[in-house]
A protein has these predicted regions:
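Glycine-rich ThDP/TPP pyrophosphate-binding loop and its adjacent helix/strand module
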Residues: 1-118
Length: 118
Protein backbone atom coordinates (compact mmCIF):
# COMPACT_ATOMS: atom_id res chain seq x y z
CA UNK A 1 0.00 0.00 0.00
CA UNK A 2 3.02 2.32 0.19
CA UNK A 3 2.81 2.83 -3.59
CA UNK A 4 0.47 5.78 -3.03
CA UNK A 5 2.99 7.43 -0.74
CA UNK A 6 5.69 7.10 -3.40
CA UNK A 7 3.33 8.30 -6.18
CA UNK A 8 4.01 5.25 -8.35
CA UNK A 9 1.81 6.29 -11.25
CA UNK A 10 3.21 3.54 -13.47
CA UNK A 11 1.59 0.89 -11.23
CA UNK A 12 -1.86 -0.53 -11.87
CA UNK A 13 -3.48 -3.24 -9.72
CA UNK A 14 -6.71 -5.06 -10.43
CA UNK A 15 -8.99 -6.57 -7.80
CA UNK A 16 -11.38 -9.31 -8.92
CA UNK A 17 -14.36 -8.53 -6.70
CA UNK A 18 -16.74 -11.44 -7.34
CA UNK A 19 -17.97 -11.51 -3.72
CA UNK A 20 -17.41 -15.26 -3.41
CA UNK A 21 -14.79 -17.31 -1.63
CA UNK A 22 -14.32 -21.04 -1.15
CA UNK A 23 -16.74 -21.19 1.80
CA UNK A 24 -19.48 -18.97 0.36
CA UNK A 25 -20.41 -15.31 0.04
CA UNK A 26 -17.64 -13.05 1.34
CA UNK A 27 -20.16 -10.87 3.19
CA UNK A 28 -21.44 -13.91 5.10
CA UNK A 29 -17.92 -14.93 6.14
CA UNK A 30 -16.51 -11.49 6.97
CA UNK A 31 -18.04 -8.05 6.57
CA UNK A 32 -16.27 -6.20 3.78
CA UNK A 33 -15.73 -2.45 4.00
CA UNK A 34 -15.78 -0.42 0.82
CA UNK A 35 -12.84 -1.54 -1.29
CA UNK A 36 -12.90 1.82 -3.04
CA UNK A 37 -12.60 3.80 0.20
CA UNK A 38 -9.88 1.53 1.53
CA UNK A 39 -7.64 1.92 -1.53
CA UNK A 40 -8.32 5.67 -1.78
CA UNK A 41 -7.26 6.08 1.86
CA UNK A 42 -3.83 4.75 0.87
CA UNK A 43 -3.50 7.34 -1.90
CA UNK A 44 -4.56 5.25 -4.88
CA UNK A 45 -6.60 6.40 -7.87
CA UNK A 46 -9.62 4.07 -7.74
CA UNK A 47 -11.67 2.96 -10.73
CA UNK A 48 -14.65 0.66 -10.21
CA UNK A 49 -15.99 -1.14 -13.29
CA UNK A 50 -18.22 -4.04 -14.28
CA UNK A 51 -15.45 -6.60 -14.55
CA UNK A 52 -17.13 -8.91 -17.04
CA UNK A 53 -17.40 -6.05 -19.53
CA UNK A 54 -14.23 -6.00 -21.66
CA UNK A 55 -14.92 -2.51 -23.04
CA UNK A 56 -15.24 -1.15 -19.50
CA UNK A 57 -11.96 -2.82 -18.48
CA UNK A 58 -10.09 -1.51 -21.52
CA UNK A 59 -11.44 1.99 -20.82
CA UNK A 60 -10.32 1.74 -17.18
CA UNK A 61 -6.79 0.81 -18.24
CA UNK A 62 -6.77 3.79 -20.62
CA UNK A 63 -7.82 6.09 -17.77
CA UNK A 64 -5.13 4.56 -15.54
CA UNK A 65 -2.44 5.40 -18.11
CA UNK A 66 -3.33 9.08 -17.85
CA UNK A 67 -3.45 9.32 -14.05
CA UNK A 68 -0.38 11.18 -12.80
CA UNK A 69 1.04 11.14 -9.29
CA UNK A 70 -0.89 8.10 -8.01
CA UNK A 71 -0.97 4.36 -8.63
CA UNK A 72 -4.30 3.08 -9.93
CA UNK A 73 -6.41 0.18 -8.72
CA UNK A 74 -9.23 -1.16 -10.85
CA UNK A 75 -11.98 -2.80 -8.80
CA UNK A 76 -13.44 -5.29 -11.27
CA UNK A 77 -16.92 -6.15 -10.01
CA UNK A 78 -17.26 -9.55 -11.63
CA UNK A 79 -19.68 -12.44 -11.71
CA UNK A 80 -17.84 -15.69 -11.03
CA UNK A 81 -18.32 -18.12 -13.92
CA UNK A 82 -20.14 -15.47 -15.94
CA UNK A 83 -21.99 -16.94 -18.90
CA UNK A 84 -22.01 -20.54 -17.69
CA UNK A 85 -25.31 -21.97 -16.49
CA UNK A 86 -23.27 -24.55 -14.57
CA UNK A 87 -20.80 -22.21 -12.85
CA UNK A 88 -22.25 -18.71 -12.61
CA UNK A 89 -22.25 -17.28 -9.06
CA UNK A 90 -21.42 -20.62 -7.43
CA UNK A 91 -18.68 -20.57 -4.78
CA UNK A 92 -17.85 -24.28 -5.12
CA UNK A 93 -16.07 -23.55 -8.41
CA UNK A 94 -13.11 -22.23 -6.42
CA UNK A 95 -12.09 -25.86 -5.98
CA UNK A 96 -14.44 -28.10 -7.98
CA UNK A 97 -13.35 -30.08 -11.04
CA UNK A 98 -16.08 -30.28 -13.69
CA UNK A 99 -17.45 -33.62 -14.80
CA UNK A 100 -17.39 -34.43 -18.52
CA UNK A 101 -21.11 -33.56 -18.67
CA UNK A 102 -20.48 -30.21 -16.98
CA UNK A 103 -17.64 -29.45 -19.40
CA UNK A 104 -20.01 -30.17 -22.29
CA UNK A 105 -22.62 -27.76 -20.90
CA UNK A 106 -20.02 -25.10 -20.13
CA UNK A 107 -18.69 -25.27 -23.70
CA UNK A 108 -22.25 -25.09 -25.06
CA UNK A 109 -22.95 -22.00 -22.94
CA UNK A 110 -19.75 -20.32 -24.12
CA UNK A 111 -20.45 -21.15 -27.77
CA UNK A 112 -23.93 -19.62 -27.45
CA UNK A 113 -22.46 -16.53 -25.85
CA UNK A 114 -19.84 -16.24 -28.61
CA UNK A 115 -22.54 -16.55 -31.31
CA UNK A 116 -24.61 -13.85 -29.62
CA UNK A 117 -21.63 -11.48 -29.84
CA UNK A 118 -21.10 -12.11 -33.57
Amino acid sequence: MSAGNYKLDNLCAIVDRNRLQISGNTEDVMKQDSQEERWAAFGWNVLSVPGNDMDALVHAFELAKHCKGKPTVIIANTTKGCGSSVMENKAEWHHKVPTPEEVEQIMKDLDERKEALS
